[in-house]
Each structure stands twice: as C-alpha cells, then as structure tokens.
Amino acid sequence: MIRKEVFIRNDIEVNEELIYDCSKKVMQLINVDREKIKRKIVQECFNKEFCFQTNNLNKKNDIGEITLSVKNKDISVEFINNSIEKFKQDINLLYDATYLDAPMVIADLDHPFIQRNIVCNHRQDIVKKFLNKNHDISIVDEAIADERLDKVMASLNKVVKGKVNSDRRKIVINIEGVEEPVNIQNLSSGMKSFAILKTIILNGYIKDRSVLILDEPEIHLHPKWQIILADVIIQLQKEYEITCVINTHSPYFLNAIEVFAEKEKISDRCKYYLAEKSGITDVSFSIDRIYELLSDAFDTLDEIQGEE
C-alpha cells in the first residue's frame, strides 16, 4: 500500500504519481520471466560480438548450434536467421573471460560510448578492463597478487618497463629511461600488445581460474618477444591455474609454449588441437602434425628455389 504523502528529498519534490510509477516498475521487474531476460542478454551478446551475423551467411535459415561442455554439463544455443531459437544452460560459469586479439583496440580507448555499454563485444570489454581497475579485488587480494606476479612482471618488463596512466585527454606510459610519458598510440604494435596485457593483469582481471583467450598473439611480435609472451602465459597458468585458449600459426610460439610448460612442469595441463575442415582434432600426443602443417610454407619456398 503506497502512502499518500509528498516527500521532499534533496530539495526534489516526489509526489504520489512518481511513487506509484516507481512501484509499478519494481513489480514488473519482480514478475518478469528470468529465462526471457537471460535469453535477451545472450542474444545481445552475440549480436554485439558478431555484428548480427551469427549464422552461416549462405544458410541463415538452417540451425546453427554453439555448445560449451564442462565436465559433461552443457551450455548450448541454437540460432536460426541470427535469432536464438533454443537456449539450454546446465551449469553456471562464474569465471570472467578476457579475449585479446589485436593491439589495434588501443584506437578505441577514447571512444565516448564504450564505458556506458552494459553488454559489449570483446574489444569493448578489453577497453573497459584497460581503463578501469577491478573493484571486486580486495586490498588483501592485491597484496597476495603482488607476490605471485613477480616472475610475470619481470618477463613483461623486458618489453614494456613502465606503467600506463590515463586522464581525460590521453593515455600515456611512463617508460624508464624516457624523459617524458609516451602516448600509447605511438608505441609499436608489439609493445601495445604487451602494454594491454600488462595493464589488464595489474588492474586485477587475471585471477584464479580466469579464462584468457589469445587469437594469434604472435602477430606483430619479434620471435624473441614471442618467447617472452609464452613465458608469461605459462607463469600465469602456473600461478593462477587460468584456462588459456591460444590460436597460433607460429612454430616459434608453439615451441616456446611447449618448452616453458616442460620447464615449469605443467606439460600435463596442456592440450594441443589441430583445426581441420572435418573438425577439431586433439593432437596432444602427436604435436608433430601441427609442425608439419606450419612448415608447408617453407616447403613451398624450397620448391620455388629449386626451380631456379
């Protein structure tokens, strides 16, 4: 029952009609179908991520299915014509995922609308994590993280020895040995990649059992930097038991992951897969198949040289 009174709060008059409207909206929220809200959020996520092109463009009216299986429990979504037809969730995933694919996301750092989006694609998510600290991390968590990250930061500092700072006008990085802060837009693509990863880690978004997805992280990186990045990834996995999904076309980077995993005695945690037209094949016990595929380009060059 709403009391028929006029309330004065902070010099703003709140009348009976406004109170009634607010209470009505609250009741609507309480009674709304939660499954409908969940489906709406998932639909919005896919729309943002795939720009309203989730289904095969040549077969939009066919069922397109995406399934994530964790310990024999599934989260699955079926799409027809880019709209959700069926959504099934047997398990609640409470771990945050961070998807890094290109340093060009730096160009979006000053976009005025990104920070306001509730549902965002993976690049907008990176921008938010780059610019803002994770407020779910306590002071105690930060203190513990400082010790656990010593080796990780030591490796990252071989490439980017400095800290990112931002204000309303620009984002800069203070690099040791450079007299004034460097605008992050002026860094090389490789340094941008390391600066993004380092800042996201320092902001508290890589924590226990986080999910880190790296799409061809070797792009723009010198082979020596690929080795440093592999070391960082293995150290993060060892300290935080993160799930790291990596897509690579670099034999240097793949070999570096193998070497550091063996060095840190976590080779048993690594799985290797080969993407083929017929599907995804587990080649963890026959990794040579990946190297053979990656060496095809060199074989082609050898053939061309042999023709001369």
Predicted regions, residues:
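Walker B catalytic acidic pair
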Residues: 215-217
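Phosphate-coordinating catalytic segments in nucleotide- and nucleic-acid-processing enzymes
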Residues: 2-209, 278-308
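Conserved aromatic-histidine-acidic binding/catalytic patches
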Residues: 185, 221, 245
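Conserved D-loop-proximal element of ABC-family nucleotide-binding domains
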Residues: 222-223, 227
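C-terminal lobe/lid and adjacent interdomain/linker elements of RecA-like ASCE P-loop ATPase modules
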Residues: 228-308
